[in-house]
Amino acid sequence: MVQRSKSSANWLREHFNDPFVKQAQKDGYRSRASYKLLEIQEKDRLIRPGMSVIDLGAAPGGWSQVTSRLIGGQGRLIASDILEMDSIADVTFIQGDFTHDEVLQRILEAVGDSHVDLVISDMAPNMSGTPAVDIPRAMFLCELALDLATRVLKPGGDFLIKIFQGEGFDVYLKDVRSKFDKVQMRKPSSSRDRSREQYLLGRGFKGA
């Protein structure tokens, strides 16, 4: 029999005792992450019917489920992740590593000549538990997401991204502030207390 590590056993115990995990199962959401977006939506009203949205780091689909329901049949949602994701009606899914140019090009092709209203990203690298390694990896993904957002957002569009406090955060925040009229931080109650994650919200894209 394989012996579970203490940290693995603790994670499993926390996961199955997590009220948001239980609520997600009850509500039919694919992950507890749905409640993070729902809480931000309740406060900021980011997502509206008929919007065009890109969802990065989408698998298993918790944010895409919420977004698809809110934008309705007249909206458009392009989702992407390195992992597979079970299909969601009317959602265009692009599987691949977002750090590869080929995947970026596929997303840009899906957007086409039009622009989008909102880019959301719940991307995170595989965490090693060593901040000196994990934070730079996470910031690299944030930089790539911001680069995409500046290419595809309409003037006045919005940007929501998961970010971790650490080296490079202040420079990144300054960069986002230069591109958006208003920038705020969000820490949903459904985000675990011990997690360093926060969500950075940029409203009112100034244009490329």
Swiss-Prot record:
GO cellular component: cytoplasm
GO terms, molecular function: rRNA (uridine-2'-O-)-methyltransferase activity
Coiled coil: none
Alphabetical UniProt keywords: Cytoplasm, Methyltransferase, rRNA processing, S-adenosyl-L-methionine, Transferase
Source organism of this protein record: Pseudomonas putida (strain GB-1)
Binding residue positions for S-adenosyl-L-methionine: G61, W63, D81, D97, D122
Gene that this polypeptide is encoded by: rlmE
Family: Belongs to the class I-like SAM-binding methyltransferase superfamily. RNA methyltransferase RlmE family.
Protein function: Specifically methylates the uridine in position 2552 of 23S rRNA at the 2'-O position of the ribose in the fully assembled 50S ribosomal subunit.
Catalytic activity as recorded in UniProt: uridine(2552) in 23S rRNA + S-adenosyl-L-methionine = 2'-O-methyluridine(2552) in 23S rRNA + S-adenosyl-L-homocysteine + H(+)
Active site annotation, chain numbering: K162 (proton acceptor)
Protein name (Swiss-Prot/TrEMBL): Ribosomal RNA large subunit methyltransferase E
Enzyme Commission number(s) from the entry: 2.1.1.166
Chief localization: cytoplasm
Location within or outside the cell: Cytoplasm
Keyword Glycosyltransferase attached: no
Enzyme class label: transferase
